[in-house]
């Protein structure tokens, strides 16, 4: 059997294969209330039907002010739980495990009214200037991640991912470009890591399942985070109880990274080796052979697929065929699953 289609354990959760649907914002909550819609059900469940092992839902805001846009999913109140519970049931029906990415946009929120950040520095000249979070407000953010994690548990999710990448709030705290604080949340790396550590520990108070953290392994900017900065971060995350790091890049500043097949895989490889923690690799991974090479050469433990799964919900089926594997079809589709 290929490694791509071998089982993988995240704590006590067993994935049927190592293909993960990357969290990708769909901006499709038309009522602006954070509640998942029929679109979300069809979108995510179709990828589970296609054979994906773990489906991670898009950035789901823990505070209303933490949305990237008004059209984002949310878990800041109990009314948002039932629709997600139904969606999780659909994922489980097709044998996929269900993950959710808990997030706060910070200064990258595009919303009416006040937005917040670790320091009062706008994303760019076209963006609103955020208000610097007080220590009390930071503690409330941490508490809201905990509350959202509890709601995720109530909805039946198997995995929680904490979004600490792509220039959103936690990433803003981690990077010296966006964190100019002079208190115990700013300055040295250990201080800048504090909010993420506090969030992980708070989530663990109500959640005993696996925790993944998504990071941006480089800011692609002078004075920003580089790969070597993430080795100690990853070691601290491991000590705090994180199971796996989902390794992306960029998003903190408005710069286009160099993009080519597998362009982010070396970052996952280096963090895996440098910190001794499991990683997920992503970045233009589009074929089964490519994914298999990454796993067999121990460059990562999971394959996180984004845009290819938008193009092709049956990526797992096609990857299996490329690797000479056969995977079980949904019974409703078995007559055509060749």
Swiss-Prot record:
Q: Which family does it belong to?
A: Belongs to the NADH:flavin oxidoreductase/NADH oxidase family. NamA subfamily.
Could you say which cofactors this protein requires? FMN
Where along the chain is substrate bound? 27, 163-166
Q: Entry's PANTHER family?
A: NADPH DEHYDROGENASE C23G7.10C-RELATED
Its biological purpose is as follows:
Catalyzes the reduction of the double bond of an array of alpha,beta-unsaturated aldehydes and ketones. It also reduces the nitro group of nitroester and nitroaromatic compounds. It could have a role in detoxification processes.
Q: What GO terms in the biological process aspect are recorded for it?
A: response to toxic substance
Question: EC no.?
Answer: 1.6.99.1
Which reaction is this enzyme known to catalyze? A + NADPH + H(+) = AH2 + NADP(+)
List the Pfam families hit by this protein, alphabetically: Oxidored_FMN
Naturally occurring in which organism (per UniProt): Listeria monocytogenes serovar 1/2a (strain ATCC BAA-679 / EGD-e)
Entry protein name: NADPH dehydrogenase
Keyword flag Flavoprotein: yes
This protein's source sits in the domain of life called Bacteria
Q: Which HAMAP family match?
A: NamA
Q: Which GO terms describe its molecular function?
A: FMN binding; NADP binding; NADPH dehydrogenase activity
């Amino acid at each position: 059997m290929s490694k791509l289609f071998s089982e993988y354990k995240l704590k006590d959760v067993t994935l049927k294969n190592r293909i993960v649907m990357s969290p990708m914002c769909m901006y499709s909550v038309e009522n602006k209330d954070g509640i998942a819609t029929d679109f979300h059900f069809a979108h995510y469940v179709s990828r589970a039907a296609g054979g994906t092992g773990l489906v991670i839902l898009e950035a789901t805001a823990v505070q209303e002010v933490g949305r990237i846009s008004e059209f984002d999913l949310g878990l800041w109140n109990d009314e948002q739980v039932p629709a997600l519970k139904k969606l999780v049931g659909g994922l489980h029906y097709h044998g996929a495990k269900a993950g959710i990415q808990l997030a706060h946009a910070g200064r990258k929120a595009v919303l009416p009214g006040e937005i917040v950040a670790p320091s009062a520095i706008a994303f760019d000249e076209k963006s609103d200037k955020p208000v610097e979070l007080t220590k009390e407000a930071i503690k409330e953010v941490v508490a809201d991640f905990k509350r959202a994690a509890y709601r995720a548990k109530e909805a039946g999710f198997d995995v929680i991912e904490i979004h600490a990448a792509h220039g959103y709030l936690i990433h803003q705290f981690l990077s010296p470009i966006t964190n100019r604080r002079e208190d115990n949340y700013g300055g040295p790396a250990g201080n800048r890591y504090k909010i993420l550590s506090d969030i992980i520990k708070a989530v663990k108070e109500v959640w005993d399942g696996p925790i993944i953290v998504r990071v941006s392994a480089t800011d692609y900017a002078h004075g920003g985070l580089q790969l070597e900065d993430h080795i100690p971060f990853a070691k601290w995350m491991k000590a705090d109880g994180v199971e796996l790091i989902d390794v992306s890049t960029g998003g903190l500043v408005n710069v286009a990274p160099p993009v080519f097949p597998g362009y982010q895989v070396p970052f996952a490889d280096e963090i895996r080796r440098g910190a001794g923690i499991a990683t997920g690799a992503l970045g233009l991974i589009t074929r089964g052979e490519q994914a298999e090479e990454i796993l067999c050469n121990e460059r990562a433990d999971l394959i996180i697929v984004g845009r290819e799964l938008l193009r092709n919900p049956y990526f797992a089926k096609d990857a299996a065929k490329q690797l000479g594997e056969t995977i079980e079809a949904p019974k409703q589709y078995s007559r055509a699953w060749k």
